[in-house]
C-alpha cells in the first residue's frame, strides 16, 4: 500500500482518535494528544459527511467538556486547525476554544 504523507497523517490521527475514544468510553480523562486527536478526527469526519465549514467549526466546540479531559488540557488547546476534505474541496477549519 502506497500512501502519501497526507494520507499517513490522516491514518495517524484516526488511530490516536480511536484510542482516545476507547479510553473516554472507559471513563478515563483524555490527555493533550488524545483530546487533539479526538477533536481533529471528528472535524474531518464531519467535513466528509457534507457539513458546511461553519457547522464543522461549531461542532468542534461541542465534542469535549472540561470533565472529559485532564486538568490544564483546555488551556493548552486555544485552537485547533485542520485541513478537512469537504464535498467541494479541501478547506482549512479553525476551532477556537474547542474545550469550553
UniProtKB/Swiss-Prot annotation:
Its main location: cytoplasm. Pfam families: Urease_gamma. The keyword Hydrolase applies. Its EC number is 3.5.1.5. One of its GO terms (molecular function) is nickel cation binding. Pathway: Nitrogen metabolism; urea degradation; CO(2) and NH(3) from urea (urease route): step 1/1. Keywords: Cytoplasm, Hydrolase. GO terms for biological process: urea catabolic process. It is found in: Cytoplasm. It comes from the Bacteria. It catalyses: urea + 2 H2O + H(+) = hydrogencarbonate + 2 NH4(+). One of its GO terms (cellular component) is cytoplasm. NCBIfam families: PRK13241.1, urease_gam. This is Urease subunit gamma. It comes from Burkholderia cenocepacia (strain ATCC BAA-245 / DSM 16553 / LMG 16656 / NCTC 13227 / J2315 / CF5610) (Burkholderia cepacia (strain J2315)).
Amino acid at each position: 500500500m502506497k500512501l502519501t504523507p497526507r494520507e499517513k497523517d490522516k491514518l495517524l490521527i484516526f488511530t490516536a482518535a480511536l484510542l482516545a475514544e476507547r479510553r473516554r468510553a472507559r471513563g478515563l480523562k483524555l490527555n493533550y494528544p488524545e483530546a487533539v486527536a479526538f477533536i481533529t478526527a471528528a472535524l474531518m469526519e464531519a467535513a466528509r459527511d457534507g457539513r458546511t465549514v461553519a457547522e464543522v467549526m461549531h461542532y468542534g466546540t461541542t465534542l469535549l467538556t472540561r470533565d472529559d479531559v485532564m486538568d490544564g488540557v483546555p488551556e493548552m488547546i486555544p485552537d485547533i486547525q485542520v485541513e478537512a476534505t469537504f464535498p467541494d474541496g479541501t478547506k482549512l477549519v479553525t476551532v477556537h476554544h474547542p474545550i469550553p
